[in-house]
Amino acid sequence: MDAFKEEIEIGSSVESLMELLDSQKVLFHSQIDQLQDVVVAQCKLTGVNPLAQEMAAGALSIKIGKRPRDLLNPKAVKYLQAVFAIKDAISKRESREISALFGITVAQVREFFVTQKTRVRKQVRLSREKVVMSNTHALQDDGVPENNNATNHVEPVPLNSIHPEACSISWGEGETVALIPPEDIPPDISDSDKYFVENIFSLLRKEETFSGQVKLMEWIMQIQDASVLIWFLSKGGVLILTTWLSQAASEEQTSVLLLILKVLCHLPLHKASPENMSAILQSVNGLRFYRISDISNRAKGLLSRWTKLFAKIQAMKKQNRNSSQIDSQSQLLLKQSIAEIMGDSSNPEDILSLSNGKSENVRRIESSQGPKLLLTSADDSTKKHMLGSNPSYNKERRKVQMVEQPGQKAAGKSPQTVRIGTSGRSRPMSADDIQKAKMRALYMQSKNSKKDPLPSAIGDSKIVAPEKPLALHSAKDSPPIQNNEAKTEDTPVLSTVQPVNGFSTIQPVNGPSAVQPVNGPLAVQPVNGPSALQPVNGPSAVIVPVQADEIKKPSTPPKSISSKVGVMMKMSSQTILKNCKRKQIDWHVPPGMELDELWRVAAGGNSKEADVQRNRNRRERETTYQSLQTIPLNPKEPWDREMDYDDSLTPEIPSQQPPEESLTEPQDSLDERRIAAGAATTSSSLSSPEPDLELLAALLKNPDLVYALTSGKPSNLAGQDMVKLLDVIKTGAPNSSSSSNKQVEERVEVSLPSPTPSTNPGMSGWGQEGIRNPFSRQNQVGTAVARSGTQLRVGSMQWHQTNEQSIPRHAPSAYSNSITLAHTEREQQQYMQPKLHHNLHFQQQQQQPISTTSYAVREPVGQMGTGTSSSWRSQQSQNSYYSHQENEIASASQVTSYQGNSQYMSSNPGYESWSPDNSPSRNQLNMRGQQQQASRKHDSSTHPYWNQNKRWR
C-alpha cells in the first residue's frame, strides 16, 4: 500500500513529476559516468579506444551501421567528400574503383553519395521554407505579396497539366490569385467538400515541403465523394501527385512514397484522361524495382489492379459501341424495309430504287466494319501529347492492315485483314514492330500457298474469301460492276439455292443472284444479267434485313467445295495417287524389347530367408498390458529363450595369442633346453620309473628356481647356477621313475567342447577357482599339506576313471576290466561325495592336470605361458585326437605306475614328492610332440585343431 501511495503522489502534482525527471536525470548521468570509467579502464589495459570508430563516425556525421565493419574508414570518407565536392553522381565503374581502392563495398559508396545529396537538399529546402515563412509574414503585415525567385519550384509542375478553364489560381511570378468559377464546382456537395474544391489546388501548388505535402494528401484521403474525386482528377491533380512522387523517389522519402501510393489507390483513376494516366503509369512503373520491398510490392500491386480495371472497362466500352452500332444498322434496315413494303409493289423501278438505296447502305455498313487503321479522332490533338498511353487503350487504337507489296501477285488466299494489337501488359507498338508484323504475315501467306499443291494441280480453281456479303443489286449498279470485272475476277460468285420437291439444289451462276417469289417455297434461280426483283404469281417480295453478324462473318461459298469435289472425281487414279504421295506420312515402328530369361528374378517365396523371417516375426509377440506397472523393464524378450542357460557349454576361444613374458636367457640356451627336454622325455618313457633323489635335493635347496620353472617368471639366480641345475636335470632325467606315469595322467588335451555333460564325478566343476591358474605359487605351497588315506584313495579313483575313459577307444583288450573298475569307482564316489565337500582344497589340486589347456605348455622347460582355463566339459572329446600308440603305452603302465605313486605319497604323509619329470611343465605333451610329429603332419589336413595351433607352436 505504501508503494501504491507513493506512485499516486508522484503523478498527482507537477512537483512530483519534476522530482521524477530529476531522479531519472541523475540515474542517466551516473550510467554515463560508469560507461566512461569502463572505456577508460579498457583503453588503459588494451591501449586501444573501444569507441574510436563510433567517435569518428559521429564527428564525420556518418550513420553508424549495425556492425563496426559497416563503417567507412577515415581515408575513404575524405576521398569520397573530395569527389562529392566535384560531382554528386558517379558511375558504376567509378564506384567499383573506389571500392577496390579503399576496401569498402559498392553499396557503401552509393549510400554515401545518396546521403550527402539528401543532406544538401534538406539544407536547401530549409532555407526555402525560411524564405516562404518570411514572405507569409510580410503578406500578412503589408497585404502585398513579395515575389522572390528563390521561392520557385526546383521541378515545377507542367503547365499543360491544367486546363485553361480549370482555375485561375496562380503560383508563378506576375500572376494573381482568382477563385474557381461556380460552374466548375460539382453540385450537391457538402460544405467540407466545397471548401476542399475551392482551396486544394492553391495549396497543392504552393506547398514545397514534404511535411506539408503529407498533410494535403491526408486531406485528399478524407474525401469520400466520388464526384469530388473525379473533379480533382479532371482538373490535373494527378500530375501534381506525379511530380511529388518523382521528388520523393529521388530523395528516398519512403513515408511520402507510401502515402502517395495510397492516394493513387484511393482515387478513381479509370475516370482520368489518358495523358494523365500515361504520366502516372511511368512514375509508378519506375518504383517496381525500388530497393525497399514494401514500396516495390505496393507499386506492383497497384499496376496489376489498374491493368485489370482498364481491361474490364475497355471490354465494356467495346461491347457498348458494338451494340449501339448494331442497333443503328438494324433501325436503318427496318425503316427501309417498311418503306419498301408500304410503297407500290407494281412499279419495278421504285423497287429497284429502294434496293439501290439499300445496297448503298449495306456498303456503308460494310465499310464501317472493315479494317480499322490509325484514324484521327476528334481528340487526336490531345492524344499526340501522350508520352505513353494505357496498354488497353493502345490495343484498341493500333490496328494494322496488311498492304500488298508492288509487283507481287496475290497469293492463293486473298490478303485478309490482320489485326495486331498489344496485349494488356505489353508496351505500345512501334513502327518497327508494325513492319515486322507485316513481313511475317506475308511470309506466312506464301508458306501456306506452297503447302497447298492441290489448286495448282487442278488448274483454275482457287479458294478465295468473299470480299462482299450477299446484297441485292439493281440495273443502275450494273455499269460499275461491268467496269470492275477485272478487279473481281477471283471473287467467288454466290450460288443460288432452289428447293425442288422439298429438296434444295446447289447451282452455280454467272452473275449476281436474283430472288424471285414463286408458288410455294422461295426459289432462287440463276440469271445471266444484272439482278432484278420480279414477282411471279405470288405476293410481293419482302426484303429481309441482313443481320450484322452475317455481314461481319460471311460464310464460305459452297461453289468452291462443289467444284473441288467435282474436279477430284474427274482426276485419274495416278494423279490422285501422286497427290497422296506428296502428303505421305512416314511411320516409324518403335524398337521392340525382348525379355531375356536370365533377367527373371524369383519372388523369394521358397527362399531359406522366408523361414528365418517367419521365425523372427514369431518372436515379436504383441502384448497388451493393463497398466504401466505391469509392463516389464524389457518387454521384447524372445519367446523361445532357453531357461538357465549353462555358459560352460560355450567354449572360450581366444581371438589373439596370449602375451608371453620372455626370459633373459639367450635363444641358444632355449633351443638347447628344448632338445634336452625332448631327449629326457623319450628316455624316461623307455626306462623304468625311479625317483631322482639328487635332483629333488637340488631343487629343494633352491625354491626360487622351482617357482621360476613352474610360473614361467625369471628368478634371482645367477646365470651360472641356472646352467648347473639344468645340467643336473639333463643327467637325472633318465632316472626319473614316476614321470612317465604322470605324463600319461597329466596330459592336457584340447579339442572342441562336447555338448553332453561328463559322467565323471571328479570333473563336476568344484575347483573353478583353482583351474584359473594351476601353476601358481599358492598351489605349489598347497601340495605340502597333509592328506589322509581316504583323500588319496578318492584321488586315485578319479585318476583311474579318467584314464579308463581314454583307453577303450584304442585298446579293446582292456575294455571289460576298465568298465568294471569304472563302475566300482563310481559307487565309491557316490559314497564319498559328502566328504569331498570338506576337502575342497585337495580336490582342486587333483583337478589341476585335467583342466590345464595346451596354451600353458608351449615351452618344454623353464617357460610357462599364462594358461587359460576352460571348463571340464571341454575335455571330454580331447582323447579322440591322439594316436593308438600313446593309449597303448598309457594302458600298459597305467595301473602299476599310479599304484606306486599312491604308495609313495602315502608313505610320506603331509608331503608330496616332486621331480622334473613330475613337474607340470614336463607333462606328456612334450614327449607326445616329439613322438607323434609324423602323425601330426599326417593328420594336419584332417584335424582343424592342428591347423589352428600351428601358430602357437
Curated annotation (Swiss-Prot):
Q: What does the UniProt entry report for the null mutant? A: Plants show late flowering phenotype (mutants LD-1 and LD-3).
The record lists the lineage as: Eukaryota, Viridiplantae, Streptophyta, Embryophyta, Tracheophyta
Q: Which UniProt keywords apply?
A: Developmental protein, Differentiation, DNA-binding, Flowering, Homeobox, Nucleus, Repeat
Tell me, in a sentence or two, what this protein's role is.
Seems to play a role in the regulation of flowering time in the autonomous flowering pathway by repressing FLOWERING LOCUS C expression.
The encoding gene is LD
Q: Which PROSITE patterns match?
A: HOMEOBOX_2
* Species the sequence originates in: Arabidopsis thaliana (Mouse-ear cress)
Where along the sequence lies the DNA-binding region? 63-123
5 X 5 AA repeats of Q-P-V-N-G: region residues:
498-538
Where is it predominantly found? Answer: nucleus
Q: Where is the composition biased (Basic and acidic residues)?
A: 608-623
- Could you tell me the Gene Ontology terms of the biological process aspect for this record? cell differentiation; flower development; vegetative to reproductive phase transition of meristem
Any one of the GO CC terms: nucleus
How changing R618Q affects the protein? Answer: In strain: cv. Akita
Query: What happens when you mutate A457C?
Result: In strain: cv. Cvi-0
Q: From the Swiss-Prot or TrEMBL record, give the protein name.
A: Homeobox protein LUMINIDEPENDENS
Impact after mutating H884R: In strain: cv. Lac-1
Effect upon mutating V536F: In strain: cv. Cro-1, cv. Lac-1, cv. Sakata and cv. Sha
The tissues in which it is expressed are: Expressed in shoot apex, root apex, leaf primordia and floral buds.
